[in-house]
Curated annotation (Swiss-Prot):
GO CC field: endoplasmic reticulum membrane; plasma membrane
GO annotation terms (biological process): ensheathment of neurons; glial cell apoptotic process; lipid catabolic process; membrane lipid metabolic process; membrane organization; neuron apoptotic process; phosphatidylcholine metabolic process; photoreceptor cell maintenance
Annotated transmembrane regions: 35-55
Protein name: Neuropathy target esterase sws
PNPLA domain segment(s): 954-1120
Active site: S987, D1107
Amino acid sequence: MDVLEMLRASASGSYNTIFSEAWCQYVSKQITATMYMYCALGMMGVLFLAWFMYFKRMARLRLRDEIARSISAVTNSSGDLRGLRFRKRDKMLFYGRRMLRKMKNVSGQMYSSGKGYKRRAVMRFARRILQLRRDNMPLEMRTVEPPAEYLEETIEGSDRVPPDALYMLQSIRIFGHFEKPVFLRLCKHTQLLELMAGDYLFKITDPDDSVYIVQSGMINVYISNADGSTLSLKTVRKGESVTSLLSFIDVLSGNPSYYKTVTAKAIEKSVVIRLPMQAFEEVFQDNPDVMIRVIQVIMIRLQRVLFTALRNYLGLNAELVQNHMRYKSVSTMSGPINSQTSQSSRQTPNGPPMGISHPLNLMQSTASGTGSGSGSGVSVTVTRPPPSPSRHSREEHTLSDPNPNPDGSVHGTSNLFTEVHGDAPNADLFHQQQQSVGNLSTRRSSITQMTPDGSHSCPPAPGVTTSIDMRLVQSSAVESLRKELGLSEEDAHIIEPFVELRELEPNVTLITEGNADDVCVWFVMTGTLAVYQSNQDATRAKQDKSDMLIHFVHPGEIVGGLAMLTGEASAYTIRSRSNSRIAFIRRAAIYQIMRQRPRIVLDLGNGVVRRLSPLVRQCDYALDWIFLESGRAVYRQDESSDSTYIVLSGRMRSVITHPGGKKEIVGEYGKGDLVGIVEMITETSRTTTVMAVRDSELAKLPEGLFNAIKLRYPIVVTKLISFLSHRFLGSMQTRSGSGAPGAPVEANPVTHKYSTVALVPITDEVPLTPFTYELYHSLCAIGPVLRLTSDVVRKQLGPNIFEAANEYRLTSWLAQQEDRNIITLYQCDSSLSAWTQRCMRQADVILIVGLGDRSHLVGKFEREIDRLAMRTQKELVLLYPEATNAKPANTLSWLNARPWVTKHHHVLCVKRIFTRKSQYRINDLYSRVLLSEPNMHSDFSRLARWLTGNSIGLVLGGGGARGAAHIGMLKAIQEAGIPVDMVGGVSIGALMGALWCSERNITTVTQKAREWSKKMTKWFLQLLDLTYPITSMFSGREFNKTIHDTFGDVSIEDLWIPYFTLTTDITASCHRIHTNGSLWRYVRSSMSLSGYMPPLCDPKDGHLLLDGGYVNNLPGHLWRYCRASMSIAGVFPPFCDYRDGHLLLDGCYTNNVPADVMHNLGAAHIIAIDVGSQDDTDLTNYGDDLSGWWLLYKKWNPFTSPVKVPDLPDIQSRLAYVSCVRQLEEVKNSDYCEYIRPPIDKYKTLAFGSFDEIRDVGYVFGKNYFENMAKAGRLGRFNQWFNKEPPKRVNHASLNEYTFIDLAQIVCRLPETYAVNTADLFSEDEDCDGYISEPTTLNTDRRRIQVPRAGNSLSFSETEMDSDVELDLKLERKTDKSTQSSPPTSSRTSMRGKEEARHMDNWHWGAKHKNETGSGATEGIHTSTEQEQEHQQQQQQDQGVRAEQLVYKDEDKENRSSANNETKN
């Protein structure tokens, strides 16, 4: 609130009547009346006390006399009884009665009588009186410190495993998972090497054919430069290894590898374990599946680290690939291809293959003896010079640029011959060759021409290629691809059916970056292909239109092997540079060839390795791969920083230990983040301890590698400076907003963006499956999302996937799904099964789902979850039925019983979630629900935005009666379709924000705000609240009552929407952020304007709290913190916090618009509304001194010009708001906040009677403001998920289409992944042909998040079968339709075998049955009608056989709707 106006009015004398007459008369009367009453009461109290003490004394004396008489009587009679004794028969009777008497006394204590009953009653009464005040206090939230395991790393202990075996096991893990027998066979080939200090482990020209593991000591790896100098690459310590993944592929391919620039020397006496790479060769001969997986793991690591991390963080693009021009030999004769020249290209895989001649016979016939003995023709050899010595040859290439740059690449076939002869070749040459071939047998060929618009046609090839027999071109392509794949001449028939040809015009895109559907192996016959990557350094305006040129692919070269081996999406965009002819083999065909010849993976891998630059090999030697289990530390505080780490998978937590031993979370890191780079570059010790929150994989980049790269490529320094600058600015913003004691521990906004979420039910009554569907439905509006259950994984990967032997397949598959989706939902089982434990290991955050109206007790299963995932962040989700209109209550009991919960969410659920139906009925219901557009204002959408880091925050500033404009702005925000996920407020903004979070209905909020404003206009009640102005003018009793009546005894934890208020803590001289506790008290504290009300005393620690606007004017029981936020200093007394006793004042003194606090709490987009008063800055310059008499003269003289000089109250107010003004300027200049100020300056701070008028001003201004934002296109970041248009059909890919490619399973014919047990046929998420994933386009482009999700065809795990009785009834009704719509299976039988055909028949039968039973749900299931089967068979005939395709893609909306209409008819 603003105190300036009231102080000015009081100084001018407008309030003299109030303070001099009414106040003095009232006080004098009250003092006179109460003086006599207090005297009388005092006298009566003294008399009563004297009477009580007298009678108590007399009673004590009478009791003492009576005891003395009793003792004397006993002593006088003892002498007569001394000689008597019991008879034997009386002795037993006496002791028996005595024992029974004792038993009676014991049993009597069970009733409300007996000995000691009165004493116990008095004690209970006293205890009740002593605890009377404590019982009246609200329930407090326990401030329980997180468990030690949450902030401490696990101490390593490996006593059960010998050190040498442990080190070797960790070192060879980089090649993937090895079973125990395979590992023991590798151990037999190990050798121990003992080195003294200064001895070489290996030198230049030594064979690079071993893996070295340091068992003890220390080894230094050096790199030799061209000038003869050496540079330390890394230091290998105990347990670490020295190896090269690229050399591993060279050795297995039969190409000897030698150290060219790398040497290793012992720093001290060391013992090294040597494992020859030939040992793997022996193992691979007996276990080809192990070889396939090792090659796949190596290729995946190369792609994720070398082609992703080095590109993103160091700006290396073209430097990673050799862009040299290879010597080509193009023969125009039909003759055998020179095998010697082909083999010579593999003699030096490590260096640039200069002088390599690779023949390309376009005229060779594949028929044995046909054309091989034809006359000698003209052999044309094209030799190109090596590239220029420039190390930074980069090129920007726009997608719309049709003209390639003149860089020496081949431009069409005509240019190829013009380079040699000077003009185009004679067409008679090709005509003669065509006549010498004769009649050749007809072969299968697929020759198409692709135009830039994506259409396919068959025009004649450009230039001289029109006279070439396509059969000869086909045979030449087969022969060239056979040699590239390392197959013998006898194996030519294996690849011949799968080789396809294509004619390309310039600038035709073969595949785009991130595309996983069109992966092929392309072989260039003529022309040139260009390989691009998206430009990371380009601005946002150019990033979507420009790509970075990486290298060219010339005739005789192959491309596409990396994506083929990894099974992932393509890392490059490939386009034709000129008129070109290519031969290609599709992914499914390659996998079929691998089944017959598994060793082609080595040739594909060797082709990828040959293309890499020497820089990549040096990086390969320097990189270390680290696998950490949950709790293991990457590095510890105060250790030396000699390396940085790239998070490949998992989640890391950074913890700082203060000098007193207290630990605090600094931040968390997810996939792709760079950890520890600041300390490494600044050469300082580690400032924090970084540990693994869950099972994680990291790549370690040593400092020597960075130095070597910086010396060779100075552009890396610029990239690092840009990266460090952004990180430094982010840390500074975080510190500025989280420096207060009340700030939350998790101040890093990145912490709230998760990629994996585990859903755990508290009890069996929780509808977890409907809850997961609803959350999935809301997440689909943001981006690609995937829902996984135990049945889904079993159907996709096999029933035994959770066994230890399948660990690699499961982890790799899950990792790939996480890469392709922005978030993955892991739905746990209701028991502690293997799948539930896997979910705990994979989760970044665990959502504990419970029913808000049930008991808050912690179950045994929930405690086990906390034990398994102690370091994983856990959040509580409480569900409430919408029909009962229930509000959250007793949330503190839930949180106090679960100290491991860091955050909670209240979710209002529709009726369908709590309907008890069969699993099939639930899935059938959501098959229709998921076709609709999700409600962006629902609690599920709010939770979805929180999990993905897209929360929208609303900050309401302080300004007294002008805060009525907040109500109008809230209505305008709601009409604009902007959801509100978090609310923060100061002063009057704290009151309005708390009303919105509690009611979420604009009508109810308006009514309650109007009633409170009317109470503030009743001045007679305020006059009764006046007091002696020592601390403040008012006592605050009536003001507290108005706020308490508005909110009641509601806690901040019980609000629907996350809420915080900000107050000024005058005890600790800082601002405090209140996210829990009494609502009305902290709202009152935030409104405690200095001078009007006393500060509120914080009940937590006793600190005095004032209006938070003094430090930040835009930011328990609910009313308390609202009251604290409105404690205007001087008007209302400071509010005392009931927790710690701190005095709280109005938050406007520190931060009147706390948008920075909202940003630190996790809001990505913020709307800040400021209604505070603005100071007049146009003041009079009065010189060096100022006379008060002169100001008085100027004020009273009407004939002089007025002067603007601040008075004493104005100066004090401006001093109080200095911090607030600085904070407000930072908010206005921030890019995450939309600052809005309605035109309400003409209304005074205390004009509460103009509530409706101020509200209408705010509404009209807000409506026009958001309409203008929508027209300008700036409203998208707030309602980018809001779509007013009717839903449209969008084709989505299924999980089976883009699934994990396990090459070992494909090649070695392991058990089929879709095989399921009969016991699982009617389980959750069941379908006869394996799981079809949730609707998601697996394109991870960021632009996807800006496109509103339209209703579309969805496929997910809802296609469970009905019971047997239901199936029989439905089959009897629709037997004819089932017979007519059954698709033929002959084509699938020839393609996939009898077993797969039977499996596909069952799947199509289930899909057909689904179409019959639910007409509305047919659009959401991947079915196959007769039209679709014909269309798919036609595509297979045109494009070749796809062996591994398990399901078929959806057709467009028209085909689908027409097919459904036919099914209905």
